[in-house]
Curated annotation (Swiss-Prot):
Function: Catalyzes the attachment of isoleucine to tRNA(Ile). As IleRS can inadvertently accommodate and process structurally similar amino acids such as valine, to avoid such errors it has two additional distinct tRNA(Ile)-dependent editing activities. One activity is designated as 'pretransfer' editing and involves the hydrolysis of activated Val-AMP. The other activity is designated 'posttransfer' editing and involves deacylation of mischarged Val-tRNA(Ile).
EC numbers: 6.1.1.5
Primary localization class, coarse: cytoplasm
Protein known as: Isoleucine--tRNA ligase
Compartments, record wording: Cytoplasm
Co-factor(s): Zn(2+)
Positions of Zn(2+) binding: 897, 900, 917, 920
Pfam families: Anticodon_1 (PF08264), tRNA-synt_1 (PF00133), zf-FPG_IleRS (PF06827)
Family note: Belongs to the class-I aminoacyl-tRNA synthetase family. IleS type 1 subfamily.
Lineage of producing organism: Bacteria, Pseudomonadati, Thermodesulfobacteriota, Desulfuromonadia, Desulfuromonadales
Keywords noted in UniProt: Aminoacyl-tRNA synthetase, ATP-binding, Cytoplasm, Ligase, Metal-binding, Nucleotide-binding, Protein biosynthesis, Zinc
Length: 927
């Protein structure tokens, strides 16, 4: 007789292979056809709200691996919150204005752009941005990210532009907006001001020069004995091109300075830097003649090296001993510290450089010259006049434009600023930073330091594609009309016709009838031509999105972006909200690191180490990308490589195989009919459910705390160690051999059903496709998608400290027995573990008591045919985990049962089934 037909062997159509690249699009199609996101939304409307506000990526180019990391993290957060009983809508957004898009359109238009109006150029930009919104939307959806893809927020919609204009009006209303001439980051290539967040630092080689500024005037009384001698203050700079803009030399009021004699010359520098500077200048024969305190030279003058004008000696605390000479070349038009200290001394904010990075034509010696080519000419002039002491080259970190990657400059121009001091914006923002939960905690210090030290916010840009700064100027007296009511009127027009109106219509048609200049009464006006910084655009998204969709909450529960956004979107959103509402727009801020290659190196097309999301999806599926996101501690830089993805693919396979094995053994199981009551479950099954409950608690807490890597390790460990290596392995005999409806088998199936049901829900936020696939194969009545369900609640706890402690000890004994079985296998005593009879001995005590309590279950726990407790095993193997345990493995007694493969002395006792053991005969008799 073929006894295989009498066994309860696993049976499932759930595929062994994930074949994710093919299967995932089918699942996406199913979600779309069933309207899954809409059903999730509908089901959650009455629940507590959890709003994650999406930071808008640029609508420009295909998504990269950093985008994938960010969107998947957000999706994991939202899905886990929904499964925890929250209403968690997701409104994706796109940043549609700004330089990245305008430059791409410029490139596309080429020479045609010269003959186009601003409105025509803006229309091209809108078409371009719209095209990339659609492409990126599909790419994000392919990752399994669920949201309102058909109703995103775009910073270029009429409504959004109107809100942006209104938020600017609120700053005007509160007196926070002003126009001034200050040095700002300027890109001569892109011809526009740049925000702090648009500046990247990269290694750059610059000239390094030491220059003499000859003292001109009467020496202080303390140095009278040096009268008549040639005295010069020595400065050091890496920007020779700024020497034509020099107006002062700055000293630290609290540092001692030295007069150094070198031949017939006297050089002034900080005393603490003398030896280093002299070594750098190659001067060995020198001596310090005098030391003095800097204030004795305050407001005295040097001569500019090659212009006939004074260079004022001033004092400033920003001067340090970290580099240079302690005498700082000061050009108020080309540096923030220079500007601030220059204001204190009434210096002109002089800038001799135009928008394109050329000296103005009237700049003596260098007129019309590009500054990046002027360093050599300036050095030559300094040499000619005998002022250059040393010229060399230095490699250092230097600011570059984030778009064109070219070095930028500090340059004073007329710009619009939001004041950090008016209405106490800086102080209020710093205070509110402490109201926010920063994850990780160091995020708080990072943004605090940035806000504490940042200059006024330059919000004007000299480009076409953006929301205009809705300020008018009197055509007669030139005064700016900073009137919030007029600005609100314009915003209402934008609501209907968009901000293109600003560039299309004359000022008269954009203003309320009867508007006159408050200064001179004139009624003719011109319009501001600058547009708003895109960081202001995205910074007001809390007002444009959260305040305008009634199903979202303000402030948001969470902002989640890369760590670069402490100086970007987190920063601009904080200032935009505190400046108008005196509240933060977010309760919590979570940041992740950057994606690097497997060796921890930055990704670069030139190096060839870029990992593209679409390539990963084609090879492994989006699911492995999602698992990669969850498996990493995202707070640091996150590594990715084929090796890492392959390792995760193997881990995924183990999780999938665990699910498949359980599904196979749930064949024919109907939860409504076959579930065993909690108090009827076998002890091993109760232990498994206790471990499940522990896992569920840890995983749910990890979701709540955004510790996703804990989830990956916990679930993977549970599936591969506690389930596959022990529990499911031990269950095989009971599941396959026991009677179909026996309590032993139904108890195991009940536990497995509950385990799979719980785990499928637990992994759904991460392995969204696979969880859905498992869900479709689960027995019993259930919702049409796992994503419409919630995490499992345990109304009756299975946790039992005494039970879990007993099984911890049994597992240690099992580990020692497994080692003994492996030795016996190597010595050819046995082949399979079922060939074995295990002898155990232990002295009186806890171990022996445990063995005696579980005497009848030990064989199934060890997956051997027989276990016998004996008084003494002198030749037994000493346990590694339990040194008082002795283990010996022998060949099992009796014959091998053809049905269960266990050895038993009862095989042959049955005339009807002579090849079976008593247990199998009993099962067949009861059928």
């Amino acid at each position: 007789m073929d006894y295989k037909q009498t066994l309860n062997l696993p049976d499932t159509q759930f595929p062994m292979r994930g074949n994710l690249p093919k299967r995932e699009p089918e699942i996406l199609e199913k979600w779309q056809s069933m309207g899954l996101y809409e059903k999730m939304e509908e089901a959650g409307r009455t629940r507590p709200n959890f709003t994650l506000h999406d930071g808008p990526p640029y609508a420009n180019g295909h998504i990269h691996i950093g985008h994938a990391l960010n969107k998947i993290l957000k999706d994991i957060v939202l899905k886990s919150r929904r499964m925890k009983g929250f209403y968690a809508p997701y409104v994706p957004g796109w940043d549609c204005h700004g330089l990245p898009i305008e430059l791409m359109v410029d490139k596309k238009l080429g020479k045609k752009k010269r003959d186009m109006t601003k409105v025509e150029i803006r229309k091209e930009c809108r078409v371009y941005a719209d095209q990339w919104v659609k492409i990126q939307s599909e790419e994000f959806e392919r990752l399994g990210v669920m949201g309102e893809w058909d109703r995103p927020y775009l910073t270029m919609t009429h409504h959004y532009e109107a809100v942006t204009a209104r938020e600017l009006a609120r700053f005007v209303e509160k007196g926070g907006l002003f126009k001034g001439k200050k040095p700002i980051h300027w890109c001569s290539s892109c011809v526009t001001a740049l925000a702090e967040a648009e500046v990247e630092y990269a290694d750059h080689k610059s000239p390094s020069i030491y220059v003499k500024f000859p003292f001109d005037g009467e020496l202080p009384a303390e140095l009278n004995d040096l009268a008549g001698r040639k005295l010069s203050f020595v400065i050091w700079t890496t920007t020779p091109w700024t020497i034509p803009a020099n107006l002062a030399v700055c000293l630290n009021p609290n540092l001692p300075y030295a007069v150094v004699e070198t031949g017939d010359e006297l050089l002034v520098m900080a005393e603490g830097l003398v030896s280093g500077v002299m070594q750098e200048l190659g001067l060995e024969n020198y001596r310090v003649l005098k030391t003095f305190e800097a204030p004795i030279f305050e407001r005295k003058t040097c001569r500019h090296p090659f212009y006939d004008r004074p260079s004022l000696l001033i004092l400033g605390d920003h001067v340090t001993l970290e580099a240079g000479t302690g005498c700082v070349h000061t050009a108020p038009g080309h540096g923030q510290d220079d500007y601030v200290v220059g204001l204190a001394y009434g210096l002109d904010v002089y800038n001799p450089v135009d928008n394109y990075g050329r000296y103005y034509e009237d700049v003596e010696f260098f007129g019309g010259m590009k500054i990046n080519q002027a360093n050599g000419a300036v050095n030559a002039k300094l040499t000619e006049v005998g002022a250059l002491l040393k010229e060399s080259e230095v490699s250092h970190s230097y600011p570059h434009c984030w778009r064109c990657k070219k070095p930028i400059i500090f340059r004073a121009t007329e710009q619009w600023f939001i004041s950090m001091e008016a209405n106490g914006l800086r102080e209020k923002a710093l205070g509110h930073i402490n109201d926010v939960n920063w994850v990780p905690r160091w995020g708080r210090d990072r943004i605090y330091n940035m806000v504490e030290n940042r200059p006024d916010w330059c919000i004007s840009r000299q480009r076409s594609w953006g929301v205009p700064i809705t300020i008018f100027y009197c055509a007669k007296c030139g005064e700016a009309l900073e009137d919030s009511k007029v600005m609100d009127y314009v915003a209402d027009l934008f609501e209907e016709g968009g901000s293109d109106l600003w560039f299309d219509k004359p000022a008269k048609e954009l203003m309320p009838a009867g508007t006159t200049c408050p200064g001179c009464g004139h009624d003719e006006f011109t319009k501001e031509t600058d547009i708003l910084d895109v960081w202001f655009d995205s910074g007001v998204s809390h007002a444009a999105v959260l305040d305008n969709r009634d199903y979202l909450s303000w402030p948001a529960d969470l902002y989640l972006e890369g760590s670069d956004q402490h100086r970007g979107w987190f920063h601009s959103s904080l200032l935009a909200s505190v400046g108008t509402r005196e509240l933060t727009p977010y309760k919590s801020v979570l940041t992740h690191g950057f994606v690097v290659d497997g060796k921890g190196k930055k990704m670069s097309k030139s190096v060839g180490n870029v990992v593209a999301p679409e390539e990963v999806i084609k090879k492994y599926g989006a699911e492995i990308l999602r698992l990669w996101v969850a498996a990493q501690d995202y707070r640091d830089d996150i590594r990715i490589s084929n090796e890492i993805l392959q390792r995760l693919s193997d881990a995924y396979r183990r999780i999938r195989n665990t699910a498949r094995y359980i599904l196979g053994n749930l064949s024919g199981f109907d939860p409504s009919r076959d579930m065993v009551a909690d108090d009827q479950l076998l002890e091993l099954d109760r232990w498994a459910l206790a471990k499940l409950e522990d896992l569920a608690g840890r995983v749910e807490k990890a979701y709540e705390d955004y510790e996703f890597h804990i989830i990956y390790h916990a679930v993977h460990n549970f599936c591969s160690v506690e389930m596959s290596s022990f529990y499911l392995d031990v269950l095989k005999d009971r599941l396959y051999v026991s009677g179909t409806d026996s309590i032993a088998r139904r108890s195991a199936q009940t536990a497995m059903y509950r385990i799979l049901d719980c785990i499928t829900r637990l992994i759904a936020p991460v392995l969204s496709f696979t969880a859905e696939e498992i869900w479709a194969f689960m027995p019993g009545e259930r919702s049409e998608s796992v994503h419409l369900g919630e995490f499992v609640q345990f109304p009756t706890s299975f946790r039992d400290a005494a039970l879990e402690e007993r099984y911890d000890n049994l597992l240690e004994i099992r580990s020692d027995v497994s080692k003994a079985l492996e030795l016996a296998r190597n010595e050819k005593v046995i082949g399979h573990s079922l060939d074995a009879r295990v002898l155990l001995s232990a002295p009186a005590g806890a171990t022996l008591e445990l063995l005696e309590k579980y005497r009848d279950q030990l064989a199934s726990l060890f997956i051997v045919s027989q276990v016998e407790l004996v008084d003494d095993l002198a030749d037994g193997l000493t346990g590694e985990n339990l040194p008082d345990l002795k283990v010996k493995v022998e060949k099992a007694l009796g014959e091998k049962c053809e049905r269960c493969w266990n050895y038993a002395t009862s095989v042959g006792d049955s005339a009807e089934h002579p090849a079976l053991c008593h247990r199998c005969v009993a099962v067949l008799t009861d059928r």
